[in-house]
């Protein structure tokens, strides 16, 4: 009966996520340059680790969504998929969110939190304009290269970003429980030499920060805190802490049915490792921000932490306890960042489906945005068109804007540039062809977001989608970028 129930829950969730737009998958056959002055770099590295850098609508690691040709975003990674609201006492003694994700929004319709009127849509001063550069794109620039070659490649990528009118780069530095920098906690990434744990021939992060700052770009270090492997992939090196935990039978990691390996949010050892790893980056490198992706719990399977829950659940439901674990990590990371350098910011990019965030990834976004001491900004992946049947852009924008209840938290909107020119398979009949039939969606989305009270900027996913688009969508990508440039 338990298996039948689990299957039914997975099917229901999958249908919900499909309706919200699917998951973006990195295009591995980029076309030629899209605009004069664009520098062409090596094509994105083939993904051998279980999906692309982002995951907007993630069901369960045990029941991955079937991937369809042309669909975007990886089902393997638990990237952005949480939030809703929890009735009753909040597990962290923080502000109690409303039960219905829409309720909090509706309760605040008169306080200006959700205002998006045309009169408010002027260009904000210092607007944040960012691009995500994932490990897939870094692989082609970095693997097997000399320090000089990598410096040239990443510099060219940054020049391309600046040509888009952007001022910020969000670059992967720990995609899989590894390090693209000199670390005392995590092994060097296979992206550097091709083998995890090799001695560093040079320090990629040092170069990435220097080249960004040389161009006046803000540099954000992008980490996936829990993910070690999203599915069966490259072997872990013997010095990888996750491998040591596996060898010892520790509950600091868990493995999923599809071969994924993740740090266990309920483990004190795992939390300390994540926090220390962030502290190390902020202390040793001149990064401007720490950026977490949407990978939190990779599965709803109760067996992955049953012993920890029995020992530490404290009478909470499993779901409430899991949300508390993630909240604890987020709060401690924020404190560690500020203790090292008050000026460094900490933000998270959850997926746009707030119910999936809350119920499946156990990411309590409402608590993060309703209380001080969790984040400096939120950048939801609002990877939906205006006509999406279940999660229309405007509604999701208002929902996240309305969640922010304390001053000092900024709202950035993550936009699905990877969908330009493609069929939005799971957007429903009303939104299925929206990204093919329009060439001004990005500009309209930014214009509308500027009317939201807490809005401060946007981020495009992904670098290769706008700089090296497939030949079949190249003209439409250029049209979208031209329309966007007119409102900057």
Feature map (PLM): residue ranges:
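Ser/Thr/Gly/Pro-rich low-complexity, disordered linker/stalk segments of secreted
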Residues: 28-122
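Catalytic domains of carbohydrate-active enzymes, especially glycoside hydrolases
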Residues: 152-179, 284-289, 373-377, 455-456
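Substrate-binding cleft of secreted/luminal carbohydrate-active enzymes
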Residues: 372-392, 399-488
């Amino acid at each position: 009966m338990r298996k039948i129930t689990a299957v039914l829950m997975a099917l229901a969730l999958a249908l919900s996520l499909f309706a919200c737009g699917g998951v973006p998958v990195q295009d591995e056959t980029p076309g030629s340059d899209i605009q004069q002055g664009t520098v062409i770099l090596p094509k994105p590295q083939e993904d051998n680790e279980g999906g692309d850098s982002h995951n907007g609508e993630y069901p369960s690691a045990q029941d991955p969504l079937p991937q369809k040709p042309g669909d975007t975003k990886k089902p393997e990674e638990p990237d952005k998929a949480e939030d809703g609201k929890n009735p009753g006492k909040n597990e962290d003694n923080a502000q109690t969110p409303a039960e219905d994700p829409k309720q909090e929004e509706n309760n605040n319709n008169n306080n200006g939190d959700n205002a998006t009127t045309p009169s408010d849509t002027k260009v904000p001063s210092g607007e944040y304009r960012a691009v995500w550069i994932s490990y897939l794109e870094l692989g082609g620039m970095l693997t097997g290269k000399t320090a000089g070659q990598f410096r040239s490649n990443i510099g060219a990528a940054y020049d391309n970003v600046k040509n888009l009118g952007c001022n910020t780069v969000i670059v992967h530095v720990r995609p899989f429980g590894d390090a693209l920098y000199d670390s005392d906690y995590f092994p060097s990434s296979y992206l550097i030499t091709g083998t995890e744990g090799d001695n560093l021939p040079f320090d990629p992060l040092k170069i990435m920060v220097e080249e960004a700052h040389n161009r006046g770009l803000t540099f954000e270090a992008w980490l996936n805190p829990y993910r070690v492997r999203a599915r069966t992939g490259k072997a872990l090196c013997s010095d990888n802490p996750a491998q040591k935990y596996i060898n010892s039978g520790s509950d600091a990691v868990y493995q999923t049915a599809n071969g994924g390996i993740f740090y266990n949010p309920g483990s004190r050892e795992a939390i300390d490792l994540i926090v220390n790893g962030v502290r190390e980056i902020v202390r040793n490198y001149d990064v401007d921000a720490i950026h977490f992706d949407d990978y939190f719990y990779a599965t709803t399977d109760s067996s992955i932490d049953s012993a920890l829950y029995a020992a530490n659940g404290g009478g909470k439901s499993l779901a409430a306890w899991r949300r508390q674990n993630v909240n604890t990590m987020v709060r401690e990371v924020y404190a560690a960042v500020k203790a090292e350098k008050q000026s460094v910011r900490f933000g998270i990019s959850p997926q746009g489906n707030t119910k999936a965030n809350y119920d499946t990834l156990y990411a309590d976004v409402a608590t993060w945005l309703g209380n001080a001491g969790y984040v400096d900004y939120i950048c939801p992946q609002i990877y939906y068109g205006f006509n999406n049947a279940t999660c229309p852009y405007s509604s999701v924008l208002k929902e996240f804007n309305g969640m922010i209840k304390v001053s000092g938290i900024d709202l950035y909107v993550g936009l699905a540039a990877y969908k330009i020119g493609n069929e939005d398979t799971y957007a429903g009949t009303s939104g299925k062809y929206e990204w093919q039939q329009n060439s001004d969606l990005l500009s309209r989305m930014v214009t509308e977001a500027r009317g939201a009270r807490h809005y401060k900027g946007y981020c495009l996913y992904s670098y290769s989608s706008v700089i090296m688009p497939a030949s079949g969508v190249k003209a439409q990508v250029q049209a979208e970028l031209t329309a966007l440039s007119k409102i900057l």
